[in-house]
Amino acid sequence: MEVKTMLLLLYPRCTTCQKAKKWLDDNHVEYTERHIVEDNPTYEELREWYSQSGLPIKKFFNTSGLRYKELNLKDKIPTMTEDELLKLLATDGMLVKRPFVVNGDRILTGFKEKEWSDALL
């Protein structure tokens, strides 16, 4: 059975992503890094990760980001279908909550040290 390396999607200039990456390195957690904007998640990936995660779809959105605010998504999300939301996320990596971790069937959005410790160490 092939063991997949953990995937870390991040935006390199994001300070939270930098902290998360440092935390992973300090704790000797192996990962493959992927630029969330240059190689944004596809619709298929997002659908799979969403179904695996058990998280509400809003947790996948970067709600403090400029694009989220520009598109007035706070008001639009409640009126959109799950499929529409996943397609929207796939159009722009800046809409996706970061850092974003895929570790087998475990999905982590944002960097919360306690949550990451419990899930990854």
Protein language model annotation of sequence segments:
Residues 1, 25-27, 64-65, 76:
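A short alpha-helix capping/helix-coil boundary motif
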Residues 2-27, 31-36:
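Local sequence-structure signature of Cys/Sec-based thiol-disulfide redox active-site neighborhoods
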Residues 1-2, 91:
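Intrinsic disorder/low-complexity signal
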Residues 38-121:
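Thiol/selenol-based redox catalytic cores and closely related redox-interacting motifs
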